[in-house]
């Protein structure tokens, strides 16, 4: 057992040097909670020369030229809790990026799914005595990387994909027992002080996605 809870993904990214930006909420009239972290607005020029070669591994390994790598400095995290569509939303976002942003280079991770009750054993016993047994939470997360100059385009495509979701039936949330018409989707935007270099094979432009099958679009990370 851990003495302390592990940090959240946004907290870990902030500790690694990614500055957090807040955007509009995916649900109209939904109250947003201010982040406890300040946004890093001061950026420094990258000290890496674009014409230099980027070594791979330790000394003595084969060096690849800059043409094999793509620099990224902006990261979007798409996260939802209790999304009924499972991976349908994240697969839709991938297809939207491939079809509508084919002229820019974007990298996208696979969908990460998590589940858990989110309550301590003692609290769970108390809730059981009150005849309220919360079901487990299901969380989906996906990360999209792009360059700062392309961030507005990627941001708009993300919001368009989220807002274009079909209305779903009312259901009982596991947290408070109240009915809500739609599951909120959160988009976090981070900006790095230094560029992150990824091999071009890991970008969406090199990853074919089957647009006819709405549930099985995947990319490599």
From Swiss-Prot:
Keyword terms of this UniProt record:
Host nucleus, Phosphoprotein
Q: Where does this polypeptide localize?
A: Host nucleus
Q: Which GO terms describe its cellular component?
A: host cell nucleus
What Pfam families is this protein classified in? Herpes_UL3 (PF03369)
Post-translational modification note: Phosphorylated.
Family per record: Belongs to the alphaherpesvirinae HHV-1 UL3 family.
Q: What is this protein called?
A: Nuclear phosphoprotein UL3 homolog
* Protein species of origin: Varicella-zoster virus (strain Dumas) (HHV-3)
């Amino acid at each position: 057992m851990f003495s302390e809870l592990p940090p959240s993904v946004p907290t870990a990214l902030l500790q690694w040097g990614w500055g957090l930006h807040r955007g509009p909420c995916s649900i109209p009239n939904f109250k947003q909670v201010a982040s406890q972290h300040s946004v890093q607005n001061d950026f420094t020029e990258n000290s890496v020369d674009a014409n230099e070669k980027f070594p791979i591994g330790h000394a003595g390994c084969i060096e690849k030229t800059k043409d094999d790598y793509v620099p990224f400095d902006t990261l979007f995290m798409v996260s939802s809790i209790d999304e009924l569509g499972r991976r349908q939303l994240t697969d839709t976002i991938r297809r939207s990026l491939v079809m509508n942003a084919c002229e820019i280079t974007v990298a996208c991770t696979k969908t990460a799914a998590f589940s858990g009750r989110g309550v301590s054993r003692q609290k769970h016993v108390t809730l059981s005595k009150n005849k309220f047994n919360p079901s487990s939470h299901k969380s989906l997360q996906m990360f999209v990387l792009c360059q700062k100059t392309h961030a507005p385009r990627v941001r708009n495509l993300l919001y368009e994909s989220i807002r274009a979701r079909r209305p779903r039936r009312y259901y009982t949330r596991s947290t408070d027992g109240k009915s809500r018409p739609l599951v909120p989707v959160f988009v976090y935007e981070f900006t790095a002080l230094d560029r992150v270099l990824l091999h071009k094979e890991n970008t969406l432009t090199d990853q074919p996605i089957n647009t006819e099958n709405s549930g099985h679009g995947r990319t490599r990370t």
